[in-house]
Amino acid sequence: MALRRSMGWPGLRPLLLAGLASLLLPGSAAAGLKLMGAPVKMTVSQGQPVKLNCSVEGMEDPDIHWMKDGTVVQNASQVSISISEHSWIGLLSLKSVERSDAGLYWCQVKDGEETKISQSVWLTVEGVPFFTVEPKDLAVPPNAPFQLSCEAVGPPEPVTIYWWRGLTKVGGPAPSPSVLNVTGVTQRTEFSCEARNIKGLATSRPAIVRLQAPPAAPFNTTVTTISSYNASVAWVPGADGLALLHSCTVQVAHAPGEWEALAVVVPVPPFTCLLRNLAPATNYSLRVRCANALGPSPYGDWVPFQTKGLAPARAPQNFHAIRTDSGLILEWEEVIPEDPGEGPLGPYKLSWVQENGTQDELMVEGTRANLTDWDPQKDLILRVCASNAIGDGPWSQPLVVSSHDHAGRQGPPHSRTSWVPVVLGVLTALITAAALALILLRKRRKETRFGQAFDSVMARGEPAVHFRAARSFNRERPERIEATLDSLGISDELKEKLEDVLIPEQQFTLGRMLGKGEFGSVREAQLKQEDGSFVKVAVKMLKADIIASSDIEEFLREAACMKEFDHPHVAKLVGVSLRSRAKGRLPIPMVILPFMKHGDLHAFLLASRIGENPFNLPLQTLVRFMVDIACGMEYLSSRNFIHRDLAARNCMLAEDMTVCVADFGLSRKIYSGDYYRQGCASKLPVKWLALESLADNLYTVHSDVWAFGVTMWEIMTRGQTPYAGIENAEIYNYLIGGNRLKQPPECMEEVYDLMYQCWSADPKQRPSFTCLRMELENILGHLSVLSTSQDPLYINIERAEQPTESGSPEVHCGERSSSEAGDGSGVGAVGGIPSDSRYIFSPGGLSESPGQLEQQPESPLNENQRLLLLQQGLLPHSSC
């Protein structure tokens, strides 16, 4: 099929733009496909009509389809005209072309199983410039410089840009795209850009530049809840002055305008504050102001409030009873308030019980009461407490008036103490202990004579003991596990996610404790696999006293999150199990993870610097740690996961020195958009949070990049604490002031430059994890090239049978100047290694290869030697 110019057909008006294609099908004069003419490129002005045609020969009734950029043309007039029995013309009409009509056109027809297509026509639509970028509205401080951008395209090109400030031209001509630099404005101003080409001009939307200002005063300040020592405050912020509010100050005083007022600065939002350590029963007044980057607002109105008082703190003392002919007189000492906040005392409350029946409490003024409505023939139990408007104080010790007591006065309980119950209790305990000891002794003697008792039976070849199966059961039946999951009270969605990773408790054995935290612990375990072998794993479990279903669900959600991961540098879930407990208590959930021999990266870095046996980590090893973490985070970000808690402490170090990103307790999956906003209070790692997370509780992949920069700093400093000496509450102001973590000693400029890019105030200016991984791999490759150019490092390890005077094997290292040592100083990691062999270690891997080292069976690598080889790159190391 080919396109050619058409001179028109009878009955058709001349075409503004046309092409003709011929297709010779089987049965025509020419067999097969015959192309005529050449491809056509056509240019028309916007709004003009266009007609295209193609001819088909050798087919009686062809079904002609017009295509544009690979898609069937729908919204256009299409006509097929018969010229002869086997010749047809296909017409495509566009009444008024727009820019969207530009593209590559051709026609096609189906001949049996084969589709014939014509040569194509490239249609170009020219018109006035079209804006792809228009200047945007801005809010800026007074006299602060800013930029506006404008971009327009043709065809036809070139496109020239002119800038207008109101009705005044302030820039141009300039080629598109164009940026207007404005030194500053002092009032609301409109800007626009004008794009011109040979077809005409177009004007952009006006961009309104407004002036930022300090915010307006807050209003509707309310004290929402009040207790004796605390008060919660909420307020509505005033107009923000077109700048983000970053903090509010709550000023508290005993009286409005008092000089010694307490000021509490809180980050916002939310616009609430909890005031602590207030005095009970005290009058206070408070007011609030908020601040943005241009300064604070005026204070709002003073709001008075009073904290609640305290209930009495002491129980009445010397509570006693006196029998009389008319009744029972009760007396006690007056309760004197210990704290001024307790307030004035009200009546005393008298409680009395007779024959297991509790009577109504009596309200008594003063410290004396006469009880007449009681039965002297029955035992009586009495208590008394002080009360005030806030509540009741503690009750006194119970006073028992016996029906057999005919004394004229019932004194305080301590004056009638009886030693009989005490003596009986001690005797009972001694007798019980003696009986238990006797039983255990007799049982032990029977066990030691077990062999003698069954000698005759064993000699006859008969079994000494016969067993009968009481019942049969299956330990791994899913019904039991399902019932246990149901008892946890977790959501059906979470339960469904965990069903295929549940492991029966009987399939693994818990071992030693690896670590313990505030909410749980991690223990070593042996997991039995399907082939009967055992593999070492780590088991993470909640504390036994955490019984809330919400805590259990949050714990198991981390496991469900890890289930989706499959990457060498992201911790992978092995399974989930439930530890049964007696007496109907909730089972303890356990998350089973791969065993990481070297623990978390932060602890490993600390041990290399300040451990009992410090060792040096070469720069290549530190950069390799960063590459591994970047690989893992690149994988997570590609799956729309944000970690929210990336730090060295949450990265695990495997036996082969590869790093895995772990601890997904705070991670979230993003289902729409590219951000997650924290909606409830959680414990968050402030010193690893990005600016937008601190200010707006906003978390994206860009905030994870910020945390990765802090993690890089941790690695380069070998586990130091970031922002040492700066409190968490001061971090935001420290960062918003432009401050960042300083370059660590011995840190390469290229590495610190990457860190600094991660801490850009604009999240979109931070590099992606893919970019970070590639840059770090380049740095690592450069370090490897440098290290291979250095001399090999020789380490002579004496035989273990020849200890030094200190009693430990001696290590001799070949002497080199500091300029030659380079990063090969990592030999400190093998100080004091007992061995009877001689090894040559090369930081660059130029001496012996790993295979050569492994060919010495008489001198296997011990743990410290293996660690050094991994650091120097002489053993395999997984990569992403």
From Swiss-Prot:
One of its GO terms (molecular function) is virus receptor activity. Residues 508-785 form the Protein kinase domain. One of its GO terms (cellular component) is cell surface. It catalyses: L-tyrosyl-[protein] + ATP = O-phospho-L-tyrosyl-[protein] + ADP + H(+). CDD domains: FN3, PTKc_Tyro3. Abundant in the brain and lower levels in other tissues. Gene3D superfamilies: Immunoglobulins, Phosphorylase Kinase, domain 1, Transferase(Phosphotransferase) domain 1. InterPro entries: FN3_dom, FN3_sf, Ig-like_dom, Ig-like_dom_sf, Ig-like_fold, Ig_I-set, Ig_sub, Ig_sub2. Autophosphorylated. The keyword Transferase applies. ATP binds at L514, G515, K516, G517, E518, F519, G520, S521, V522, K540. Disruption phenotype: knockout mice are fertile, but male animals that lack all three receptors TYRO3, AXL and MERTK produce no mature sperm. SMART domains: FN3, IG, IGc2, TyrKc. The keyword Disulfide bond applies. It is found in: Cell membrane. The modification Phosphoserine is found at S456, S808, S859. Its EC number is 2.7.10.1. Belongs to the protein kinase superfamily. Tyr protein kinase family. AXL/UFO subfamily. This is Tyrosine-protein kinase receptor TYRO3. It comes from Mus musculus.
